[in-house]
Amino acid sequence: VLEFYQNHTDCFAIKSLEEIPSGLNWKDGLGEEEFSSPDAKRGGTWNVFMRDFPRTLRTIGPDANGAFRSYLSDYNALSLVMSHPNSDGYYPGLASSWAVADDRKTVYFRLDPDALYSDGQTVRASDFFFLFYYMRSKHIQAPWYNDFFGKDKFLKVTLFDTHTFSITYYKAKPDVAERVSLRPVPEHFYGELDGEYLNKYQWLPEPTTGPYVATPENIDKGKSVTLVRQNDWWADQKKFYRYRFNPDKIKVSVVRDYNKAFEIFLKGEIDMFGLAKTEFWYEKLTDKNQLVKNGYLSKVTFFNQTPPPSYALRINSQKAPLDNQDIRIGFHHAMNFKLVLEKIFRGDYVRMNTVADGYGARSHPTLQARTFSVEKA
């Protein structure tokens, strides 16, 4: 590991605290509004389903990008700073404070000294050195991550002490604090990687900074994985976290057929079922259903202004005839999205105008999707 750092001194540096620029505007996000409810009840088991059993408990590498990965990573582990759901600001994650340099490319972080992994080890600034050693390693067999965390995007990591470091992004961004808000990789857990990485960690979950852990004794191969909440989770009583992550356990069971899962949901053996398909909302579970009328099931539609996934028709513009912009514009005008939304989705969906909607002031204020028009097409 040390040899890797020494061979890439353009990407990794160690400096003293005195070398941190003066005059930085340090923020801690504690002025943001708390968005969780003190009335939330803690305890019990949250029962959900997945369509297939995970092929590994690794979150990186072959077979790791399945549906269950989110329960270990996205829904659970903390990043340096967290995007506030109701404002354009950030609240503390693993970092207790942060500051953006004048170049809008470098962000300085101070780790929360309370931050721990689930194995009790302290989160250290050096784990962000190790993050890049890990993500750039050939042994993880993950070309996408090798590329994403490459030195052409993340230019440099600089350590100042055990809890203070900076990350330099490749270009200035208005949301650069979020761009470099990464999750650490615990060096004490992995050490130097080798060709045994995939097999060694196939069913050995990485220590997490989040509240829930997956342990071998809570895995029923082929049937379910149960995540258990840590009783002594380090962020349990901190603002923005104290009224969240309330179930004692999250049981994720395998139900391969979507219709079968719906039947199990109606029996009360699954606690939540997405009704995104219109036939489920309007036909299979109408408002007149006795389970709904008697209050046993709640049908809820959420409206939000958060960034949606970049759903789009992807066009390969490198080859003829789609390398012609006029043809691509005509293709746009030939797409009758309004008809699709009205007939298939019954008016419940709204067409995005760009691939970056929902970013508040950062989204384009006037750009509109091209309308359906046979004449223009």
Predicted regions and their residues:
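Extracellular/periplasmic solute-recognition and catalytic clefts
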Residues: 138, 142, 157-159, 215-226, ...
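Surface-exposed binding/hinge segments that line
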Residues: 40-41, 110, 145-194, 200-203, ...
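Short, solvent-exposed loop/turn elements at domain surfaces
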Residues: 54-62, 88-91, 118, 175-178, ...
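N-terminal lobe/hinge region of extracytoplasmic solute-binding protein
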Residues: 15-16, 23-34, 44-102, 133, ...
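Structural transition elements
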Residues: 351-377
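Aromatic- and charge-enriched surface segment that lines or borders ligand/interaction sites
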Residues: 97-141, 166, 261-264, 321-324, ...
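Gly/Pro-rich hinge or "lid" segments in bacterial periplasmic/extracellular proteins
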Residues: 65-67, 71-78, 82-86, 181-249, ...
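Short, well-ordered beta-strand elements
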Residues: 43-52, 96, 106-108, 131, ...
